[in-house]
Swiss-Prot record:
Protein name: Large ribosomal subunit protein bL27
Protein family per UniProt: Belongs to the bacterial ribosomal protein bL27 family.
Gene Ontology cellular component list: ribonucleoprotein complex; ribosome
GO BP terms: translation
Species in which this protein is naturally found: Chloroherpeton thalassium (strain ATCC 35110 / GB-78)
UniProt keyword terms in alphabetical order: Ribonucleoprotein, Ribosomal protein
InterPro entries, per database record: Ribosomal_bL27 (IPR001684), Ribosomal_bL27_CS (IPR018261)
Protein origin, superkingdom: Bacteria
Amino acid sequence: MAHKKGGGSTKNGRDSNPQYLGVKAFGGQEVSAGSIIVRQRGTAFKPGKLVGIGRDHTIFALQSGKVFFRSGRNNKKFVDIIPA
C-alpha cells in the first residue's frame, strides 16, 4: 500500500506572458528615427506625417523629431512627427 496519496491533476496553473502594449512616447517627446511610439493590437492610432506602421500595427518614427497626437475625421487618432 502507498503511504502517500497520488498527486492529483489540476486544470489551472497556466498564465500568458504580458504583452507590453500602449503608448511608448508621449506628445511633445523627442524621438529618434526608428523609435517605437505606440505598440497596439489593431489600429487605434493611425500613422500620420513621418510615421510608419509595422506588420503588428506598431507605430514608429520614420524621422527624428517631436511626437504629436491629433484627432482626424470621425475621431480617428493620428500620430505625427514634427521634425526638429
